[in-house]
């Protein structure tokens, strides 16, 4: 059925202070927004994530994080830096990142979402001789999107290829002044003795670039994935308490062993990235 306003021409006449002019019809704006949303690769599980359905509770760091991210979303694209959400599993990092992306898409900005492990799998598939997709077919949208969300950074097992590929993407966006959002479960510390730190997981070059590009926002809290159906604030507070108790009981022996194993590499000058960098 044709649009009753523009008859599917995409344009409509408006009059302001006696002056008639032609502007884009709302139907075309809606169609454009739908197309942007479909091309953004947001996984079905997260497609309905927004700021209004992000459930907060008396957790100062979490509420501050949500407020900062929402302010960023309201200002985009008039921003200079992205952000990196750091925290344990299930505290809503992906929800907040997608809520920001959806807000940008709704205002006509081009955006893209990739879980890093999935992105690397897609790129690897282009090396298969029977695959018709070229590597740059995958990379080009990442290098040009107005807003890119890279979810779960550091999850992929570290290798020279992984580090080179991710550093190329991040560095290219940095040079083009394009905004990137990251999420990660790994601790933000410059200490290369901590093997499960973000710096060691992604390599020193990418870690340094991320800090140049982004504001780091770190918080903890309840695991939303454990929230029962129709659970509320009291349930979240209880889950948060349990999470805090479990964290306080974690043994330090394993961590000390890892530090001891890392010491020889540190003495040889390994920075956490490739050998010799």
Where are these regions (language model features)?
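A short, basic N-terminal segment
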Residues: 1-64, 227-277
């Amino acid at each position: 059925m044709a649009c009753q306003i523009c008859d599917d021409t995409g344009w409509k006449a408006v009059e302001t202070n006696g002056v008639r002019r032609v502007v884009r019809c709302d139907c075309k704006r809606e169609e454009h927004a739908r197309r942007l949303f479909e091309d953004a690769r947001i996984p079905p599980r997260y497609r309905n994530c927004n700021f209004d359905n992000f459930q907060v509770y008396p957790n100062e760091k979490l509420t501050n994080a949500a407020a900062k991210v929402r302010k960023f979303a309201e200002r985009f694209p008039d921003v200079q830096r992205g952000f990196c959400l750091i925290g344990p599993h299930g505290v809503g990092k992906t929800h907040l990142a997608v809520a920001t992306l959806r807000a940008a898409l709704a205002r006509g900005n081009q955006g893209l979402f990739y879980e890093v492990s999935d992105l690397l799998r897609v790129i690897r598939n282009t090396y298969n001789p029977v695959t018709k997709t070229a590597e740059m077919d995958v990379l080009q949208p990442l290098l040009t999107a107005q807003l890119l969300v890279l979810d779960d950074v550091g999850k992929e097992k570290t290798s020279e290829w992984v580090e080179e590929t991710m550093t190329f993407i991040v560095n290219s966006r940095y040079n083009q002044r394009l905004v990137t959002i990251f999420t990660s479960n790994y601790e933000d510390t410059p200490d290369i003795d901590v093997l499960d730190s973000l710096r060691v997981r992604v390599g020193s070059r990418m870690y340094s670039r991320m800090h140049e590009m982004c504001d780091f926002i770190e918080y903890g809290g309840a695991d939303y994935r454990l929230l029962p159906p129709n659970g509320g604030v009291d349930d979240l507070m209880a889950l948060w308490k349990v999470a805090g108790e479990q964290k306080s009981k974690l043994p330090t022996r394993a961590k000390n062993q890892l530090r001891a194993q890392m010491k020889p590499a540190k003495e040889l000058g390994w920075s956490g990235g490739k050998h010799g960098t």
